[in-house]
Amino acid sequence: MIALSALLTKYTIGIMSNLSNGNSNNNNQQQQQQQQGQNPQQPAQNEGGAGAEFVAPPPGLGAAVGVAAMQQRNRLLQQQQQQHHHHQNPAAEGSGLERGSCLLRYASQNSLDESSQKHVQRPNGKERGTVGQYSNEQHTARSFDAMNEMRKQKQLCDVILVADDVEIHAHRMVLASCSPYFYAMFTSFEESRQARITLQSVDARALELLIDYVYTATVEVNEDNVQVLLTAANLLQLTDVRDACCDFLQTQLDASNCLGIREFADIHACVELLNYAETYIEQHFNEVIQFDEFLNLSHEQVISLIGNDRISVPNEERVYECVIAWLRYDVPMREQFTSLLMEHVRLPFLSKEYITQRVDKEILLEGNIVCKNLIIEALTYHLLPTETKSARTVPRKPVGMPKILLVIGGQAPKAIRSVEWYDLREEKWYQAAEMPNRRCRSGLSVLGDKVYAVGGFNGSLRVRTVDVYDPATDQWANCSNMEARRSTLGVAVLNGCIYAVGGFDGTTGLSSAEMYDPKTDIWRFIASMSTRRSSVGVGVVHGLLYAVGGYDGFTRQCLSSVERYNPDTDTWVNVAEMSSRRSGAGVGVLNNILYAVGGHDGPMVRRSVEAYDCETNSWRSVADMSYCRRNAGVVAHDGLLYVVGGDDGTSNLASVEVYCPDSDSWRILPALMTIGRSYAGVCMIDKPMUMEEQGALARQAASLAIALLDDENSQAEGTMEGAIGGAIYGNLAPAGGAAAAAAPAAPAQAPQPNHPHYENIYAPIGQPSNNNNNSGSNSNQAAAIANANAPANAEEIQQQQQPAPTEPNANNNPQPPTAAAPAPSQQQQQQQAQPQQPQRILPMNNYRNDLYDRSAAGGVCSAYDVPRAVRSGLGYRRNFRIDMQNGNRCGSGLRCTPLYTNSRSNCQRQRSFDDTESTDGYNLPYAGAGTMRYENIYEQIRDEPLYRTSAANRVPLYTRLDVLGHGIGRIERHLSSSCGNIDHYNLGGHYAVLGHSHFGTVGHIRLNANGSGVAAPGVAGTGTCNVPNCQGYMTAAGSTVPVEYANVKVPVKNSASSFFSCLHGENSQSMTNIYKTSGTAAAMAAHNSPLTPNVSMERASRSASAGAAGSAAAAVEEHSAADSIPSSSNINANRTTGAIPKVKTANKPAKESGGSSTAASPILDKTTSTGSGKSVTLAKKTSTAAARSSSSGDTNGNGTLNRISKSSLQWLLVNKWLPLWIGQGPDCKVIDFNFMFSRDCVSCDTASVASQMSNPYGTPRLSGLPQDMVRFQSSCAGACAAAGAASTIRRDANASARPLHSTLSRLRNGEKRNPNRVAGNYQYEDPSYENVHVQWQNGFEFGRSRDYDPNSTYHQQRPLLQRARSESPTFSNQQRRLQRQGAQAQQQSQQPKPPGSPDPYKNYKLNADNNTFKPKPIAADELEGAVGGAVAEIALPEVDIEVVDPVSLSDNETETTSSQNNLPSTTNSNNLNEHND
């Protein structure tokens, strides 16, 4: 190598020298030729030949040296050419070389074209010679992927690693580059010369995972492999994997395994994990000693543990008892260590009684002289504590438990039940168990390990109840009530008792105060203050109680005075006044200094802060807060003062400010509360175990890069592309356009546009679809509609209101980014992006509900509906609230027998709320099995005879409902509901979801025809039908029409033709008024048939039950509908809509209506009379408006928005259904609108009727079966099981041997003969299946599993999900509350509230006293795109309403007049009048 390099260098130098000489000679020759006048075109004769001669390579170098020399020569010649190409052409003028050589030289450089000879601008704009750097970020990943594939194929592998007889092929270079262990092995040790290397003490499974990580940078860490994986990673020096295992172990740390994890970390030198485990043991010592790991420790480890000064124990008795328990675990072997252990127990801190009665009489200590001396020392310490000194008399200094900031209830803008807590270490907010009742303006205090929420306002009444929260169990209870009703009161803890001071009782401000003794559970009055004080702040300094500021309802003035209470004398005295009047000020005590924060003086909201020194009896000003705040919560911790929420006079705040007295400065916490709230209770408590686990689960979910967002008013997105989801967890593409970039790719699925798969039931309605790039479908158009018509947040709608005045310079500060008011920068960005209509831009997140999961992995687990067991703590527990009569579908398929011979599932279908096969509605003739019978909660759809059995041949008029939505929860969280049948079409980019109250009622909406087919001319099914539902009847072979339907031309209801519900009374009339017609005259005529529920005799008779006026209204509508049937030529222009509310529009010329109609029909004015005699105009719409709607939409009438508008749905929800729900009893609290849509249905199939009938479940799309869900009431398990067994015996032989289960509230315990069926067929209803809220407190939280996953393979398991804020309280809590309150709970039902978070249907105000609502006007341009330009202006109906300010309303600051007098409500400008309930 050295000789070759030297020869090559010498040869290259010779070439360079020759070229240099040749160049010099060439220049001289050219000059001579020019001087002699020779023709430059003639070649030179032997000039410069010596310099131009090619130097031959030395012998022996071969072709390689020759090639290298030629390349070097060509580079030098190119440099010469570049020096002269600007002023001469060597090819033309000659350069001592032949023209052929010159050309060959250029050819070798690929530069024969003219562009290479000139300095021209390159197409990409870069100059020649520009120095740039190219970087390909995917190069490394692609290279490693290629090497990994070669490794799997055993290509170019040069080493074989062996562990436990398992061989793994790999590349030395790759392993050495990632692991210092392999680098040293392959470079310096004997293994560098071995092709097969055996690794000792390395688990084969762990080695495979680590080798995969080296090539892919991905490794899966779970409970099964973390131990062997960490050991192997530590040995192979893969520190990243070792750290990942340590992080995982931190998330799994609890009292049962912390000792083992600490020892494991110590063995493998995982310092961070070791410190974390030791800190955890110190903080949770009292829980750790209760598990077996402690009993299995060695005596040295026990001594190290109990000798630690930092362990946190309630008393020294616990230390003594754990030592005795350890000795008793193995007395023969451990008795010898008794004296050593007892020397580290600090017996002097035990009580004298405990020493004499327990310690001195312990058998294990008898006869032990050392222990007797220790007992004597302890008794001596009690007699002479100052003279007894030893290591055992030094008190312990336990490490501080991690603290959390607990925020309870509040006003947002009405009283809420939400509870959330802030982890000071993680700087994140989490949700806790909600309060059993709505509560705001209450007092909050911490007494012992319990949190007390005292008094307050529940949205309608001032209360005197007290709710008690146990952080250890995350549950609420109650204690004895106060003597007086109080809201906006002050609460503090003094001498182990709770003091409630002042407040407002609904009539006047209070000066009284009372005290609660937890030992006796009794409230009693104490001395009253000298002044009435509501919105008062209290604090305790040096054992004295201070009442600061407030509002005096008698003088109607905000107060600056302060009173002090002495519990020893039971007296109040006045102290120094503040410099400013403050009502609603937050009060906190920090370092024995009393701070009064914010507040207001009439309309002026303050941000100033004052500090009171009780030693000098004086107030002083400190630094102002960043924002003006009143009614904020204040708490002190670790030398800092925390101010939480409040309002600034305009909106509620979600930010938290922290004051540091050392620097006299404020800062804002980086994380905001989930919602802005004022009048909230705030306290600081130790972080309990359950919340520690919740935080660990959240951290684990974050480590999986899954962003979670709980939208309080989340709904299923209505866009088609958002509805089509993936088949397995790998594609968590949620509806509503939630981004699935963070989730693994799913197997390719063919789009099923006619069979939407709703992967997500919690997607926010305001979030547009993310799949805007799909081609070949209407996805782009649908997505554009969804984005254009996405409703703006309530806080994004710029409302014209006068902001409250604030202190000087307060308005100059930017407002905090709260949940109720976005930051100005955000508003400006939104206005720039969409100047005409604000858009709601949300991050793309993955949503998922474990309780109703549609992510099927195939196989026997393909349609797993509900978790049968949940993982909680150390193992799996059976979910007693969800207990099916049959086996688990995700278990072994052998134990499940197919219900149908052609079913694609091995397990039978579980009973479901979403089961769309009705017993009363469907008796499908099934080959080989006779009449099939199905379960369905809609077993009696009383308003729709078409869904019932038609005749003896049992051919159903409707095969199935298209899509069903169902859920349970609270109406105040969602204004659109469940059990609504919604076809696969959207309404302004979003579904219009309506429902009912589950009191024996069923409702659904059917919108948007699928085509423009005409009605069938006959009854035999010979005509065409454009509705999927009519296939089962129209073309059924050999089907006949029942006699009762003989006069009906089309015995099938067009899916765009009806909007009905079987809600009774007044609500049924509102259903009638939203009756919609299709786009054909024949179809409209069909709707006048008795089968049409909106004008049927059945509906008319039931409507009459609401009163004579209701019947008259129904009759008027039927008559109006009959009279308004236009001709087929102008049917699209004059179809009846009955829109609610009335629509005003100016008449347009005929040419502007698209030529659809030139004749203006009379205006249709419908009026419904209520029982009170009030007449409310429900709908009014001109024919011109209808023509405009028709011309702008689909001429065939298949545009949903041409028939029903969002304003109509909104009006119905707010003014009809919501009061109905509010008027019901407390059972309404289990109405949740978590929308659950059926994946598949027979009527959606495009297959033939024969194929539909052959498979009762329809054509399976994704997993073999539609998804189901069931909720089971276990309290009736025994009786229901007996009923089911009995019903099985009495079944017909041809029928399926399964009892029927109805979950409607109207349950019947006995059997009922069905007269429409064959003799012997009975209907049985199992009351065990009800509308109950399923809940497992620790593992199955609020309708969804906290950590449940059916997949046994870890990489297929879905990420953990936190509880959604939109869900209801636990069923168990509700049951306990009902049992505790008894009949009183039925009488004192709580008023639901409007959603706290933005919702498109939320633009209204509620008067909870008389259940009236007043929608706010909606600008016409907001609905322009939604209704196709048909709406120009909306005048919402006038209703009685009490003026309510959602922000500034205070117990003692508003006075209103009764709405019964029909007088306008008034509000004092200064907000200082007494408020009467």
From Swiss-Prot:
A GO CC annotation given for this chain: female germline ring canal
Pfam families tied to this protein: BACK (PF07707), BTB (PF00651), Kelch_1 (PF01344)
Domain BTB residues, every copy: 157-223
Signal sequence region: none
Record-level Gene Ontology MF annotations: actin binding; ubiquitin-like ligase-substrate adaptor activity
Family matches, as InterPro entries: BACK, BTB/POZ_dom, Kelch-typ_b-propeller, Kelch_1, SKP1/BTB/POZ_sf
Keyword Cytoplasm: yes
Start-end of Low complexity biased regions: 20-46, 763-813, 820-839, 1166-1192, 1374-1391, 1456-1477
Compositional bias (Polar residues): 1125-1137
Sequence positions bearing Phosphoserine: S108, S111
GO biological-process terms attached to the record: actin cytoskeleton organization; cellularization; female germline ring canal formation; follicle cell of egg chamber migration; oocyte karyosome formation; oogenesis; ovarian fusome organization; ovarian nurse cell to oocyte transport
Region annotation Disordered: where it falls in the sequence: 19-62, 76-96, 108-137, 744-841, 1119-1200, 1291-1326, 1359-1416, 1446-1477
Alphabetically ordered keywords of this record: Actin-binding, Cytoplasm, Cytoskeleton, Developmental protein, Differentiation, Kelch repeat, Oogenesis, Phosphoprotein, Repeat, Selenocysteine
Localization in the cell: Cytoplasm, Cytoskeleton
Ribonucleoprotein as UniProt keyword: no
Domain of life: Eukaryota
Tissue/organ expression: Both proteins are expressed in ovaries, male testis, ovariectomized females, cuticle, salivary gland and imaginal disks. Kelch short protein is the predominant form and is also expressed in fat bodies. On entry into metamorphosis levels of full-length protein increase in testis and imaginal disks.
Kelch repeat segments: 404-449, 450-496, 498-543, 545-592, 594-639, 641-687
Reported function: Component of ring canals that regulates the flow of cytoplasm between cells. May be involved in the regulation of cytoplasm flow from nurse cells to the oocyte during oogenesis. Binds actin.
Protein name in the entry: Ring canal kelch protein
Annotated source species: Drosophila melanogaster (Fruit fly)
Source lineage: Eukaryota, Metazoa, Ecdysozoa, Arthropoda, Hexapoda
